[in-house]
Amino acid sequence: MRLMGLDIGDRRIGVALTDENGVAAYPLEVLERTSPEKDLRRITEIIDQYGVERVVAGLPKTLSGQIGPQGDKVLSFLDKLRVRSTVPVITWDERLTTAEVEKLLVSADLGRRRRRKVVDKLAATLILNSYLNSRKSGRNT
C-alpha cells in the first residue's frame, strides 16, 4: 500500500511517498502554495500518478496537545481534499517535526536558502516515517 505524507504550511506543502509496499518513506517534492484549488489539483495528480492509497497529513498541535489556528487551517484544507479524492486522509501529530528537521539541516551545515528548499518535504517524510513506525509497533492501523 503506497502512502503519501503531507506537511501543510501557509507557504509550502511538503510531499513524501512510500514505496509500493508502504515500507520506506522518501521525500518527493515541495509545492509552493498558490491557491487552494491549484494545491488540491496537484496533490490529487500525485495521488493518481503514484497510486496512493492513503494520505497521512501532519496536524500541528500545541505542546499541550491542543489544536491551534494553524491546525484549524490544516483541517480545513484536508476537508477539501477529502471532497476531491476517494483516498482516506488521516492526520498525524506533527509537533516539532519541522523544528527537528531544521536542527538536523543546520547541523549538516546546509545554508538557509538550501534548507528552505528541502525542509518541508523532509518534514513530510518524518511525519510519514513516524506513522509507519507506529504501524510496525502495532500502535496504529
UniProtKB/Swiss-Prot annotation:
Protein's UniProt name: Putative pre-16S rRNA nuclease
An example Gene Ontology CC term for this record: cytosol
InterPro entries the UniProt entry points to: RNaseH-like_sf, YqgF, YqgF/RNaseH-like_dom, YqgF/RNaseH-like_dom_sf
Location of this chain's protein in the cell: Cytoplasm
HAMAP family: Nuclease_YqgF
Similarity comment text for this entry: Belongs to the YqgF nuclease family.
Role summary: Could be a nuclease involved in processing of the 5'-end of pre-16S rRNA.
Main location: cytoplasm
E.C. designation(s): 3.1.-.-
Biological processes per GO annotation: rRNA 5'-end processing
PANTHER family reported in the protein's UniProt record: POLYNUCLEOTIDYL TRANSFERASE, RIBONUCLEASE H-LIKE SUPERFAMILY PROTEIN
Keyword annotations of the record: Cytoplasm, Hydrolase, Nuclease, Ribosome biogenesis
Domain of life: Bacteria
A Pfam short name: RuvX
Broad enzyme group: hydrolase
GO MF annotation list: nuclease activity
